Amino acid sequence: MFNKVISILGTLILLVLAGCRDVAPISVEEPSTENRTITLNLDITTRADNGTDTPEKLRLWICDGSDNLIQYIENSPTWQASSTKGVDWITSLQAKIKTKEIESLNFYLVLNDAYSSVDDTSPISFNINDIAALKNTSFVLTNYGGDNKVPMTGTQNLTLEANKLEYDVSIDATRCVAKLGIYCTKSNSESKLTIKSITLGNIPDKGYLFETHVDNQINYTAETLSFKGEIKKIYTDAFPNNFEDFEKIEETSFTQVYYDYLQENLNGDGDIQIVDNEIADNKRYYIKLEYTLNGLDDEKIIYLSQMKRNLLSKIYIRINDATTINTYCQINSWTEHEMEVPAFE
């Protein structure tokens, strides 16, 4: 059986605000019967982008259906602003590959560098021929310059047809990390509320570029956050029940005490749980809040729901008196509102 040549023309990478979208194939010259032209449209979802924040490095593995490497592409693409609604940036690349008796292709995309240790000065160096190792690659959190500088990955499969020479392939690359914001307020303008300490607990020491694994080698640590001091902002009304209304009062009625990237942690269900003491063997993220209200000391531990990759979670905390608090959890993707969780008391 003769070799078939597949020509990959014009990988179009789209930085979007609202997930995948359909893009018409780029018009190309009609290929010969021994060529296949594949157009790759890679959708990269983002939220909270400042308009200039673009991924810095692209790595793309093109494999057969058994994950044998056909071609590897690595570059630092030049991004161009897009006039298309819902699209921020566009870049393109070209490559040609030869195949023989291949029925399908697998694509693995990694954007930006990842590090295997916080002490590393060089990013992870991939064995480009070992796809199994690629899919099991773990990484640690480092300092990122923006939402689109974090590690992002995407996969796709393409079934080849006997007489088809041109394909559209859309790869949705998503961030491999979560993001968490914590906000505090009080319910009485006459009260004096001071945060003594905030601890974020059960932080996984590593995450995975692709699928999250059940990994007994993950260690969970706790970190004391930098914020401490008086909370002067007040919110006395009932908590809103939607994201838009919360955003309207967030800046005026709540003090932001934390806002940063986190590793994915799939322990936990859909509920927030408020307790006075840590729960043994519970590996959910938790917030330990130590505070003084009108001279009385207290502390609460708030166990969070699952912290999934590419999701932005906001925890709103209102301290009513020395022993009772209200909480509200808002979970959204960086691209659109995915889920609203009602207030838990």
Predicted feature residues:
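Bacterial N-terminal signal peptides that target proteins for export
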Residues: M1-L9
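C-terminal motif of bacterial Sec signal peptides marking the signal peptidase cleavage site
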Residues: V16-G19
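Short, polar/proline-rich extracytoplasmic segments that appear immediately after membrane translocation
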Residues: A24-P31, L304-E345
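A short, Gly/Thr-enriched small/hydrophobic beta-strand-prone motif that recurs across taxa
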Residues: A24-T46, A173-S187
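Tryptophan-paired
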Residues: D49-F126, Y183, S187-L311, T335, ...
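Structured interaction patches on ligand/partner-binding surfaces of diverse proteins
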Residues: Q80, Y115-Y167, G295-N320
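Short strand-edge motifs at loop-to-beta-strand transitions and within beta-strands
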Residues: T91-L93, Y167-I171
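Interdomain boundary/hinge segments at the C-termini of tandem beta-sandwich modules
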Residues: L160-A162, D172-R175
